[in-house]
Amino acid sequence: MCEYTVGYVDDDITSYNDYAKRLKRRGIELIFPDDRETKEQIFEWVQEKNIKCFIIDYKLNKVFDFSGTELALYLNSRIPDLPCLILTNYPKDAIDGNLVIQNMIENRDIMATSDPEKFEEFLSKVKQSVKVFEKRIENHKQEYKQLLDKKSGNTLSSSEEERFLDLYKLLRAYGEVDDLPAQLLESETSLKMDKLLQSVNNLIEKVEER
């Protein structure tokens, strides 16, 4: 069984099986989001498959309506810590675009390179990216537990409330926390507003009864 599960998306999948076999021998399961056409669908797939690192082709324009960098930016807007490695035949173009940091851009040939040293460096980067993501998830779990305690005691601020819900959605998607009762997922502001509206309704009913 592979220790690492890594996503892979490209608009040319002719070499995917070869890449997958090669990486599997090194403990990395490379999986492709079949039949996912939009950024939202790929985001949902990332969560379903518990992806902790994503290798993305730079252009993608033969099949998708967006580029690899646009997909990476979208995924990082939803999962800020998800490492996305960009593969391209033109690393300088990707670097000059200033949308992805340089150390997350790889020459496309790296997946098929016959240079063992370069391939080992690439594998190390992928595996280390996964470990960094897992460590950050652990840190998020600790923060989530602290906020959950405050939530249970009704002492969350509005900004903490928003952070709590964001962490819950992320950690739940990765199977790191259990489902919470619906009432715990309601914001304190909403609950207070509901109580206020109920009080107003009760007051109106009393006035109308007179």
Task: Give residue ranges: language-model regions.
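Short acidic, S/G/P-rich loop/turn micro-motifs used as interaction or catalytic elements
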Residues: D12-S15, E37, K59-F64, P91-D93, ...
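A generic structural motif
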Residues: R26-P33
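Acidic, metal-coordinating helix/loop segments flanking the phosphotransfer/catalytic sites
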Residues: P33-C53
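Conserved acidic segment of CheY-like receiver
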Residues: C2-T14, Y19-L23
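A short, hydrophobic beta-strand element within the central beta-sheet of small alpha/beta folds
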Residues: A72-D96, I105-E106
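C-terminal output/effector regions of signal-responsive regulators
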Residues: K131-R210
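Charged, amphipathic alpha-helical linkers/stalks
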Residues: D93-S159
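Conserved phosphotransfer microenvironments
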Residues: K52-N76
